[in-house]
């Protein structure tokens, strides 16, 4: 049985833009919602943080106004962001994302005598993104002159339409409480590994103080 000590956090917002209002060139209408919940596991097996988000852009807009994944291009890890997605790699007008973070709170390391004295803690993460681009916003399927062609570099596209049946997935294994301050994790990309110019693996850091 999970022990749910924390009430879920719910958030929803709607963002609108009007053409010719304060210099706006396009109408856009975006709706997003998210929920976050923490689950405590029995027998001191740690906790799981779960976050789910979903959103839609309802209007016809050029690609800079489409929904871009929360890509983190730095070496500093940030919660609920994607460490190995390039900026503007996927362009969606409908999306859903999920982030799971499992903090074992030293359950494994405490069984290893030498490691136990260091008081390191282990953490596992999985992040996934589902997305699609409707035909009205797809410049390859629409003749609307207001839509921009996707960006390119050296003659190759750098932005792509996701397969709605194939989510983007990345996972990581991390150690925190190093010197009571440092968090280090290894990140691996599981899907869309053939996209040009991507990193399939990486090392990320974070300053994380645990009390």
Each model region followed by its residue ranges:
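Exposed, low-structure sequence patches enriched in small/polar residues
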Residues: 1-211
